[in-house]
C-alpha cells in the first residue's frame, strides 16, 4: 500500500492512504515510543524464537518486532538472526523452487530445529511456513502474542500447544 497503491491508482486519495499506511508492529512501536501504548500485559512464561521478515527490513530498517515482544513480561524472546526464510512470498511454494527455497532458508529452519524456544514468531505468513519445516513447534504472529498478553484472543493458548508434523527430514 505504501509504495504500489499510488502507482496503481494515481490520485490524491491513493497518496493519502499510502502516506498513512504502516505495518501494525511499526505503529505499535511508535505508540510505545510516544508513551501511548498500554503496557498492562499479562506475563507469558515461555520462550520464543523471533524472525524479522525481509520485507519488514526493507520497509522500515529501524523496525524491531523483537523489542515490541520484549515488552511482554516473562516472555524470553530469542532473535533467529538467520537471514532470509527462502520463501519470497509464494516462490518457495512452487514445486520447481522448493529445493532452492529450502537451501536459502536452511539457516532459519536449522535455528528452529536447534532452539529450546517453545514457539516461533514472525509477521510473515510465508516465513511462518518455513519456520515450521522440520519442527513440531507452532509459529505465531507477534500481533497475536501481544493480543493474548492483553487478555484477548484466548485461542492463542491452543495455537501455542499445537504441534505440527515434520515436513522436512531434520
Each predicted region: which residue ranges?
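Iron-sulfur cluster-binding electron-transfer modules in prokaryotic oxidoreductases
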Residues: 1-170
Amino acid at each position: 500500500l505504501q509504495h504500489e497503491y499510488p502507482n496503481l491508482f494515481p490520485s490524491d486519495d491513493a497518496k493519502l492512504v499510502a502516506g498513512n499506511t504502516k505495518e501494525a508492529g511499526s505503529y505499535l512501536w511508535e505508540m510505545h515510543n510516544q508513551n501511548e501504548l498500554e503496557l498492562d500485559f499479562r506475563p507469558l512464561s515461555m520462550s520464543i524464537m523471533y524472525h524479522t521478515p525481509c520485507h519488514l527490513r526493507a520497509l522500515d530498517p529501524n523496525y524491531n518486532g523483537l523489542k515490541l515482544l520484549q515488552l511482554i513480561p516473562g516472555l524470553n524472546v530469542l532473535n533467529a538472526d538467520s537471514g532470509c526464510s527462502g520463501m519470497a512470498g509464494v516462490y518457495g511454494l512452487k514445486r520447481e523452487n522448493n529445493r532452492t527455497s529450502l537451501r536459502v532458508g536452511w539457516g532459519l529452519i536449522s535455528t528452529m530445529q536447534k532452539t529450546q524456544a517453545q514457539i516461533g514468531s514472525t509477521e510473515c505468513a510465508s516465513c511462518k511456513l518455513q519456520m515450521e519445516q522440520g519442527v513440531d513447534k507452532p509459529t505465531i504472529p507477534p500481533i497475536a502474542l501481544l493480543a493474548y498478553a492483553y487478555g484477548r484472543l484466548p485461542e492463542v493458548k491452543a495455537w501455542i500447544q499445537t504441534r505440527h508434523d515434520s515436513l522436512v527430514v531434520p
